[in-house]
Amino acid sequence: MTALSVNDYLRQHIRTVPDWPAPGVQFRDITPLLQNPKVFRVLIDAFVHRYMDRALRPDVVAGLDARGFILGAVVAYELNVGFVPIRKKGKLPFTTVEETYELEYGSATVELHADAVQPGDRVLLIDDLIATGGTMMAGKKLLEKLGATVMEGAAIVDLPELGGSERLRASGLPLYTLVDFSGH
């Protein structure tokens, strides 16, 4: 038996759910990655080992609602840096800044506590998946409103056919993803 790359190993543990949430959609379910402690460790270590490098080490990790919280909090803990949640509108109790972005049908708004980061902070922005890139772009804009620098965006899964990773890179945001899936 040959050794698997981390990417291939993780890919084997991502469940594809056909026709969910709508006909024709291939939903990439990351919950099996989280359920198995060995697989979860490999997943977290893949991010932690990258960001332990001094040149890539963030001051803060920001996680996007909601699965970005799971990844971001653990990665921040392992790197011994702070974690800040970027939430859907109306979920944070203190003074916030907000950013609205377009969805396929309508729009959504995310927000961040106004004191979540300091000017000049280097932030790693993390989520589970990049599809259209709208949520990550909104998170980047929020952090920049507060004077932080988003040094990189990270996700487990990239769905390149939906164009999000290309749009994010075109905006100047470097990306690190672990598993690319064609098709959506």
Curated annotation (Swiss-Prot):
Its EC number is 2.4.2.7. It is an enzyme of class 2 (transferase). GO terms for molecular function: adenine binding; adenine phosphoribosyltransferase activity; AMP binding. It catalyses: AMP + diphosphate = 5-phospho-alpha-D-ribose 1-diphosphate + adenine. Pfam families: Pribosyltran. Pathway: Purine metabolism; AMP biosynthesis via salvage pathway; AMP from adenine: step 1/1. It comes from the Bacteria. Keywords: Cytoplasm, Glycosyltransferase, Purine salvage, Transferase. PROSITE patterns: PUR_PYR_PR_TRANSFER. It is found in: Cytoplasm. Disulfide bonds: none annotated. GO terms for cellular component: cytoplasm. HAMAP family: Aden_phosphoribosyltr. Belongs to the purine/pyrimidine phosphoribosyltransferase family. Catalyzes a salvage reaction resulting in the formation of AMP, that is energically less costly than de novo synthesis. NCBIfam families: apt, PRK02304.1-3, PRK02304.1-5. PANTHER family: ADENINE PHOSPHORIBOSYLTRANSFERASE. This is Adenine phosphoribosyltransferase.
